[in-house]
């Protein structure tokens, strides 16, 4: 039910199972449906601090509060109870976050990584891609090909920003990129074969054509935020190595960084080969990192630094042994899938850096 609501932000009066999938049916405008969902979510969130339920509750209450003038007296009383429950649950999440502490893995400090002629980089023009490219280049890596995907006409997607965040307040011993440096400039140092595509999407046919499976052992993947890789690219290109911002299988889905800060007091990252099932590919490495210190940008800089560190760990293993780390297969019924975090919970998570 959480999944259905998170995807559509609607609660329907009926659902049916059709062809193995749950389909929405019936009315979705009755506020009693949202009140009842809110009550169920509040109960689930109070029973063990279940963050997916709290996140959905906050979004459900946004809908209810926007329609408050349309509620009758009984419905307003139920809404008032839910708002009191929301305040308790958010405060409990804040206190839980303040007491969270987790093991932190040391940074990767590899020497000269060397040449990887059968490895390519697929990089959307984002801050994270700049971090990956600079981390590899700074440690002496060269690749067989780099494919850069840009937005036509200067448009922007998730993961892109006109203003690069400052790294002046960074306090840990990780490689820190200069995100002002254009991606193309760094990629020219990584490979003699740089292809730039103005497709605006990873899922264009030209992308898969540029990264054939018979030419490369695998492709380091850094796409646009929020864009899922389509089946055609997965089937036609060499395997895509992705640094997921979450400790798998515990944290699948979206904005898992912030949920992890709330629950564990740490940032997890997992190196996986992408598969058709979201965040369920084989795992080749995992590391835990501290949340950002006060003054450090969490959306772009912190994310780029720590995912780049995991990438360096994987590539250092390949350089040293001639093989990627051993694969760990995930089970579909393990872990948790998260959805875009509500701004209230995101703010609490960000404050973890202020207290670090």
What residue ranges belong to the model's regions?
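One-carbon transfer enzymes
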Residues: 10-55, 59-356
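N-terminal leader/linker segments that initiate helical-solenoid repeat arrays
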Residues: 2-11
């Amino acid at each position: 039910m959480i999944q259905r609501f998170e995807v559509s932000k609607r609660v329907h009066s009926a659902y049916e199972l059709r062809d193995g999938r749950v389909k929405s049916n019936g009315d979705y405008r009755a506020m009693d449906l949202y009140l009842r969902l809110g009550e169920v979510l509040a109960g689930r969130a109070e029973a063990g601090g279940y963050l997916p339920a709290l996140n959905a509750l906050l979004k459900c209450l946004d809908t209810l509060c926007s329609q408050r003038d349309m509620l009758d007296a009984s419905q307003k009383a139920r809404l008032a109870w839910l708002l009191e429950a929301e305040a308790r649950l958010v405060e409990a999440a804040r206190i839980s976050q303040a007491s969270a502490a987790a093991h932190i893995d040391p940074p990767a400090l590899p020497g000269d990584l060397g040449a990887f002629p059968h490895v390519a980089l697929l990089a959307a023009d984002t801050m994270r891609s700049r971090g990956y490219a600079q981390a590899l280049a700074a440690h002496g890596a060269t690749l067989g090909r780099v494919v850069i995907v840009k937005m036509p006409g200067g448009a922007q997607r998730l993961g892109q920003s006109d203003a690069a965040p400052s790294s002046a307040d960074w306090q840990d011993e990780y490689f820190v990129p200069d995100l002002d440096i254009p991606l193309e400039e760094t990629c020219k140092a990584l490979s003699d074969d740089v292809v730039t595509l103005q497709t605006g999407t990873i899922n264009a046919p030209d992308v898969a054509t540029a990264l054939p499976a018979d030419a490369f052992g695998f492709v380091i993947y850094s796409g646009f935020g929020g864009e899922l890789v389509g089946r055609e690219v997965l089937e036609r290109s060499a395997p895509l190595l992705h640094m997921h911002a979450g400790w798998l299988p515990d944290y699948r889905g979206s904005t898992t960084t912030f949920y992890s800060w709330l629950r564990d007091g740490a940032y997890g990252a997992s190196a996986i080969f992408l598969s058709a099932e979201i965040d369920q590919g084989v795992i080749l490495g995992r590391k835990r990192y501290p949340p950002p210190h006060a003054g450090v940008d969490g959306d772009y800089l912190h994310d780029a630094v720590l995912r780049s560190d995991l990438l360096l760990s994987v590539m250092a293993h390949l350089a040293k042994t001639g093989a990627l780390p051993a694969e760990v297969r995930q089970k579909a019924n393990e872990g948790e899938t998260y959805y875009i975090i509500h701004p209230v919970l995101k703010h609490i998570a960000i404050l973890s850096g202020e207290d670090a």
